[in-house]
């Protein structure tokens, strides 16, 4: 296994041309990739804040994409096919890397699962996480090798703490950065720039959906609580100020029959609370 980890270090994030092409064709990260990226960022931050890690350590988001929600196989690590041997490595290359891209992509699409940042936290506390350089990059199109279960993981102990509203989220944010999901409307979000994103503004508004964000700061602007969030949208990371006032959100177009009850643009607040021994 040490030789495999050494290979990861030598390749230093380089990937197969098919991976590069697939990633370039993907306009934005999908929901699972986004959730995993936010989760590992918050885990890394929290572990430094509470002095569990002596320095900021990046953990693998793709490990979460590959494994959260996956059915567990009892005794997997003891199976012959899950041992890191030259024979198993060659079998993997023949069956996966040297097959046609279309076959691989079809298999990946069939195995795709949906999960949230909270699911990622819970999985990390249960199974631990490998360091970022010890697993595939985000968006890797190749199946996980059976022997990848032998890759060492950093154990994590803790629980997920959730906040039901903005007031509770403010308290969470005083201790460490928190995760949330943001209702995205276009073109308002695309045009916000240095201003405050305050949701839909007219009949031309289009609801994009929920996006995972990191809440990094709260402040009062003209008497209103405003959160600064970090978001990766269309694969570009930016910091945006978001209004916390409640409003009517047309989540399915501008048909009044689809308008929901007053809600906040930010929802689903949570943090990973680590146990400190």
Curated annotation (Swiss-Prot):
Keyword Cytoplasm on entry: yes
Known function: Mediates both basal and acquired thermotolerance via HSFA1s-directed pathways (e.g. HSFA1A, HSFA1B, and HSFA1D). Triggers the expression of HSFA1A and HSFA1B.
Cellular compartments per GO CC: cytoplasm; nucleus
Induction or repression: Target of TAS1 (trans-acting siRNA precursor 1)-derived small interfering RNAs in response to temperature variations, thus reducing both basal and acquired thermotolerance. Repressed by trans-acting small interfering RNA (ta-siRNAs) siR480(+)/siRNA255-mediated transcript cleavage. Highly up-regulated in seedlings exposed to heat shock, with higher levels of isoform 1 than isoform 2. Induced by HSFA1s-mediated (e.g. HSFA1A, HSFA1B, and HSFA1D) promoter activation.
Residue ranges of coiled coil: none
Subcellular location, record wording: Cytoplasm; Nucleus
Gene from which this protein is expressed: HTT1
Major place of residence: cytoplasm
Tissue: Expressed ubiquitously, including in seedlings, leaves, stems, inflorescences and siliques.
Repressor as UniProt keyword: no
Subunit structure: Interacts with the heat shock proteins HSP70-14 and At2g33735/HSP40, and with NFYC2 in both cytoplasm and nucleus.
GO biological process: heat acclimation; response to heat
Keywords associated with the record: Cytoplasm, Nucleus
Family: Belongs to the heat induced plant HTT protein family.
Protein name: Protein HEAT-INDUCED TAS1 TARGET 1
């Amino acid at each position: 296994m040490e030789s495999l980890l050494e290979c990861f270090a030598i390749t230093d994030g380089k990937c197969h041309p098919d991976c590069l092409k697939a990633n370039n064709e993907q306009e934005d990260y999908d929901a699972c990739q986004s959730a995993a990226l936010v989760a590992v960022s918050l885990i890394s931050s929290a572990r430094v804040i509470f002095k569990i890690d002596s320095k900021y350590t990046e953990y693998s988001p793709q490990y979460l994409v590959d494994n959260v929600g996956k059915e567990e196989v009892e005794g997997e690590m003891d199976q012959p096919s899950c041992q890191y041997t030259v024979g198993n490595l060659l079998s993997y290359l023949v069956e996966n890397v040297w097959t046609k891209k279309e076959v691989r992509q079809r298999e990946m699409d069939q195995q795709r699962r949906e999960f949230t940042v909270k699911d990622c936290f819970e999985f990390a506390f249960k199974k631990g996480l490998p360091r970022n350089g010890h697993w595939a990059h985000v968006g890797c199109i190749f199946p996980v090798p059976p022997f990848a279960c032998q890759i060492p993981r950093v154990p994590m102990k803790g629980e997920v703490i959730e906040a039901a509203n903005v007031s509770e989220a403010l308290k969470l944010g005083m201790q460490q950065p928190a995760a949330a999901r943001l209702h995205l409307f276009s073109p308002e979000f695309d045009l916000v720039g240095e201003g405050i994103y305050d949701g839909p503004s007219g009949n031309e508004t289009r609801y994009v959906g929920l996006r995972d964000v990191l809440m990094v700061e709260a402040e009062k602007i003209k008497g209103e609580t405003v959160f600064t969030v970090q978001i990766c949208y269309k694969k570009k990371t930016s910091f945006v100020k978001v209004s916390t006032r409640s409003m009517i959100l047309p989540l399915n177009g501008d048909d009044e029959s689809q308008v929901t009850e007053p809600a906040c643009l930010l929802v689903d607040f949570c943090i990973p609370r680590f146990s400190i021994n």
